[in-house]
Design a protein with these regions (language model features):
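Active-site nucleotide-donor binding segment shared across nucleotidyl transfer reactions
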Residues: 31-64, 68-74, 226, 253-254
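Helical (often loop-to-helix) elements that flank the catalytic cores of nucleotide-handling enzymes
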Residues: 77
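Short, cationic low-complexity segments
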Residues: 151-166
Length: 279
């Protein structure tokens, strides 16, 4: 992890266009690796809405997400790690198993020439990134137990990152401190490992539903398995990236009428960070 004691010597990335260009370069590298190794991925979430509705970024969005079936996800982590270790030192994929400072149950691909400081406790300073989410098999009979368990683990992970804040009511701060004391025996990595184990419970089963279990929108993530079987390329800004062919089923399940713009007060970014060039 990059030390930030030289931050005053770094050039800050203040332009949203510059930030987006870096993110697209990361995605283009991932796309190239996926083409090389015949790995199927799809842009997802707001990135997919952007491609369909705007032919690029949602105007107020500031990140890029992709998703892969668990088997493809594992392959991507493996081949990108090998590419990095074999000399491509610009782009690095990280999971909690690859870096002890990384505390999420999904992967990110970072640009090693950048530094990104997120103003959230527990988020270490890596670089500008693209989020990479695994999609897992889901069985109807297990969903009633899986989602509540995953929610508990997610809340545990979130609670361990909260700190005392002056603007927060005293009783809430005290409740957070008490909760964090109760959670002391459970490390972040233990929680993430439990989330992964729970998500991969049906990996060896053929199911008719899939979902991003480790993060996201809970039951709204559940979609028919068949929509992950065919992929196409969609225009995004001045490039093309892979997407599931049945993106309409996926997007309407998650977001309803995804072609309708949200109210003006909802058209805001949800991330708080600063980005820099290291050199």
């Amino acid at each position: 992890m990059w030390k930030i004691n030289r931050i005053n010597e770094m050039k800050q990335i203040t332009s949203s266009n510059e930030l987006r260009q870096i993110q697209m370069d990361i995605l283009s590298y991932v796309d190239g690796v996926c083409r090389k190794y015949d790995i199927k991925y799809s842009i997802s979430g707001g990135t997919l809405i952007g491609a369909v509705r705007h032919k690029g970024f949602i105007p107020w969005d500031d990140d890029i997400d992709i998703m892969l079936a668990r088997s493809e996800y594992d392959r991507l982590v493996e081949v990108m790690t090998n590419e990095y270790n074999n000399g491509n030192r610009r782009y690095r994929i990280i999971t909690h198993n690859l870096d002890n400072d990384y505390l999420f149950p999904y992967a990110k691909v970072f640009d090693e020439k950048t530094l990104l400081i997120e103003h959230v406790r527990g988020c270490k300073n890596f670089g500008v990134f693209v989020d990479v989410f695994p999609i897992d098999n889901v069985e109807d009979q297990s969903m009633a137990k899986t989602f509540p368990k995953m929610r508990v683990l997610y809340n545990m992970l979130t609670m361990k990152r909260l700190i005392w804040e002056k603007q927060r009511p005293l009783y809430k701060n005290l409740a957070i401190i008490l909760s964090r004391l109760i959670l002391l025996p459970f490390s972040n990595h233990w929680i993430i490992s439990r989330m992964e184990q729970l998500a991969k419970k049906c990996s060896d089963s053929k199911t008719d539903k899939m979902a991003c279990l480790v993060w996201g929108y809970g039951r709204r993530e559940v979609v028919p398995t068949y929509i992950h079987s065919e992929h196409i390329y969609l225009p995004f800004e001045n490039r093309e990236y892979m997407a599931i062919k049945e993106y309409g089923v996926y997007l309407s399940t998650l977001f309803g009428d995804y072609m309708k713009l949200p109210p003006k007060d909802k058209q805001v970014t949800h991330h708080d960070f600063e980005a820099y060039w290291k050199d």
